[in-house]
């Protein structure tokens, strides 16, 4: 499923958080949305998911204007890990099952199948507070996968986890891409993980660069985005 963002602006807290952002993603693609903290990455993902109103511009899915109903049917947003109360006394299976309540419609993926897909089948009965950071991120991804969505919006899924966990998560995302899903993944990491993506969008309130990881590195050179050196 294709996703088209055209000249989108979003206001947050009375200020314009992002402005004039345009790009188009095709089905079966894995795209990184990279920028420093405060660049508007989460704001853009939430706007695409229909959780924030647009100040300007438009969003389309497969050529159809995005409505809240369409967003709920075809989009799934994975929140940042810090937004979840991991001390809450429920199991991994129960957390993932909550994704079916968010979707609230037929066609949801089986919880056990989603857990197996992210490599957490053996941990289904484990309590949330017993998970490592990487396991928490995979549990959130599984919760996203039980929703019948064709476009996945993942907010900082690789943040604050160790390299082996990041590698495992990137492998899962690659498998989802290969299965035909469209993934847009936010990150503030300019490291070698970018090479796992088909395409990179660099955002700092506006879109600064768009291309393959190699093209973006060449285009930006030594440019600083926020406090990060891109070269």
Segments (PLM) and residue ranges:
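Catalytic Walker B motif of ABC-type/P-loop ATPase nucleotide-binding domains
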Residues: 152-155
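Helix-to-loop junction immediately C-terminal to a conserved catalytic motif
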Residues: 49
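H-loop (His-switch) and adjacent beta-strand-loop-beta switch element
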Residues: 199-212
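H-loop/switch region of ABC-family ATPase nucleotide-binding domains
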Residues: 187-188
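Conserved ABC ATPase "signature" region
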Residues: 108-123
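Conserved ABC ATPase signature
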Residues: 127-131, 135
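Conserved ABC transporter NBD signature motif
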Residues: 57-70
């Amino acid at each position: 499923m294709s996703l088209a963002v055209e000249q989108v602006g979003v206001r947050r807290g009375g200020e314009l958080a992002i402005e004039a952002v345009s790009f188009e993603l095709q089905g079966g693609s894995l795209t990184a949305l990279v920028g420093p903290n405060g660049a508007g990455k989460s704001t853009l993902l939430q706007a695409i998911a229909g959780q924030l109103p647009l100040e300007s511009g438009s969003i389309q899915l497969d050529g159809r204007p995005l409505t809240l109903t369409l967003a709920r049917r075809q989009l799934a947003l994975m929140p940042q890990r810090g937004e979840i109360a991991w001390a809450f006394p429920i199991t991994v299976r129960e957390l993932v099952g909550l994704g079916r309540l968010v979707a609230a419609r037929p066609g949801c993926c089986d919880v056990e199948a989603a857990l197996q897909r992210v490599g957490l089948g053996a941990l289904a009965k484990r309590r949330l507070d017993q998970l490592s950071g990487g396991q928490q991120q995979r549990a959130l991804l599984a919760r996203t996968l039980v929703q019948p969505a064709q476009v996945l919006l993942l907010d900082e899924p690789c943040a604050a986890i160790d390299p082996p966990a990041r590698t495992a998560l990137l492998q899962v995302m690659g498998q989802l891409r290969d299965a035909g899903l469209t993934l847009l993944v936010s990150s503030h990491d300019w490291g070698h993980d970018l090479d796992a993506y088909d395409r990179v969008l660099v955002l700092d309130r506006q879109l600064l660069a768009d291309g393959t990881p190699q093209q973006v590195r060449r285009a930006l050179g030594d440019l600083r985005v926020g406090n990060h050196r891109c070269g």
